[in-house]
Amino acid sequence: MTFDNLGEAAEIERGTWPEDQPLGQHFSVRRWLPRIVTLLARDGLRATFFAEGLNGELYPEALEALRAAGHEVACHGWRHEPWHEVADERDRLARARDALGRPVGFRPPAGRLNAGTPAILRELGYRYCSPAGSRAGRLDGLATLPFRWELIDAYYYLPHFATLRERNGDPAEPMPPAALRERVLEALEAHTAGHLTLIFHPFLMSVGDEAVSVLADVLEIAGRMDCLRMDEAAAALPDDAGPPRLDDTSWDA
């Protein structure tokens, strides 16, 4: 179980955050994060939260509370910049590492790595990455735990995922929470062994009560399964694991 994005980092990166709006009060952190933590505790789950490095400066108490509750805080870029477009990735990864308290995991915003990303991650002390893909393995020696686009809440709810939805034979228009529930529950029912990643976004709980209900239902089922934090799953990956199967598409394609 993983959660992506916290706070206003992505909106600052895109230039959509109002200049007169104070920082450090984002609803995803102040309203939804405590509720998500409560749901995880209800089902005895420990999750991984991929947070942008900026959150280490804006929400240090919230990140520390996640760790205190047994969850992992990993890196999701500095301000949610599409990673395949980043030229100064070493500087951004180092800055995020320091701001987040030296995380060991990284998930590239928009899902794609650059050719040199694995080597930089290893150099900076990261032990795994989580790009888009369908099979876990080792990429240049780095544990790689991919996610599938259709197992992300944003794939269903956000307009800019239209290209990905159409590629997969789904409607271009955003889809309701019921479609997410059906697809994720089918994947969980079919899953018997190996690695499977689910991604939810705290800010997307604002889609409505049904979005919260879907998350609650998924967590209840995950609580009956062998559900690891990502750092634990990476540590369990054999040293001689083969190459991962990655997906080179992204939501900004």
Residue ranges and their predicted role:
Residues 201:
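Conserved strand-to-loop "acid loop" that flanks and positions the catalytic carboxylate
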Residues 153-189:
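Aromatic-anchored helix/helix-loop segment that forms the rim or "lid"
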Residues 1-105, 110-152, 178-198, 206-253:
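Catalytic alpha-helical scaffold of carbohydrate-active enzymes acting on polysaccharides/glycoconjugates
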